[in-house]
């Protein structure tokens, strides 16, 4: 009986040791996983922020170029239609600078719909939900 008890005791110690090693391994794995997830998350966030900044800068550049072209085109149209004499059109203005200023200035007046109502004040119409008609067999 003594041998049997000693064998069970040794088995118990082995199970406890294995459980302790497993617990330690799981804890280490969890920490490494957490570190990995945080690293990937921080790199993803950096990439998104950098991407958004890049897109915003490119959009600003394109708006500036487009604004310059519109400004030049408007001047040519005004001169061609006789609204403004070509000599009266300011030559010292650089379309890129005017477009840059226009892109940076906020809208002073709210956008208006053709009927004169602002988009912000549009009435909320109530709607009624209809049940679909049952189709016959």
Curated annotation (Swiss-Prot):
Residues 20-67 are annotated as: 4 X 11 AA tandem repeats of [EGS]-K-T-K-[EQ]-[GQ]-V-X(4). Signal peptide: none annotated. Expressed specifically in brain. Phosphorylated. Phosphorylation by G-protein coupled receptor kinases (GRK) is more efficient than phosphorylation by CK1, CK2 and CaM-kinase II. Residues 88-137 are annotated as: Disordered. Keywords: Cytoplasm, Phosphoprotein, Repeat. It is found in: Cytoplasm. Residues 88-97 have a biased composition (Basic and acidic residues). Residues 98-131 have a biased composition (Acidic residues). One of its GO terms (cellular component) is presynaptic cytosol. One of its GO terms (molecular function) is cuprous ion binding. Sequence repeats lie at residues 20-30, 31-41, 42-56, 57-67. The keyword Metal-binding does not apply. SUPFAM superfamilies: Synuclein (SSF118375). The modification Phosphoserine is found at residue 118. Disulfide bonds: none annotated. Its main location: cytoplasm. The keyword Transferase does not apply. Belongs to the synuclein family. May be involved in neuronal plasticity. This is Beta-synuclein. The lineage of its organism: Eukaryota, Metazoa, Chordata, Craniata, Vertebrata.
């Amino acid at each position: 009986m003594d041998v049997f008890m000693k064998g069970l005791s040794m088995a118990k110690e082995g199970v406890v040791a294995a459980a302790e090693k497993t617990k330690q391994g799981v804890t280490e794995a969890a920490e490494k996983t957490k570190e990995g997830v945080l690293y990937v998350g921080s790199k993803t966030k950096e990439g998104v922020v950098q991407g958004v900044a890049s897109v915003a800068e490119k959009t600003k550049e394109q708006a500036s170029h487009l604004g310059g072209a519109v400004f030049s085109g408007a001047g040519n149209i005004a001169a061609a239609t006789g609204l403004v004499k070509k000599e009266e059109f300011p030559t010292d203005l650089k379309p890129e600078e005017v477009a840059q200023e226009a892109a940076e200035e906020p809208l002073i007046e709210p956008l208006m719909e053709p009927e004169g109502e602002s988009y912000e004040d549009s009435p909320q119409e109530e709607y009624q939900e209809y049940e679909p008609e049952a189709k016959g067999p």
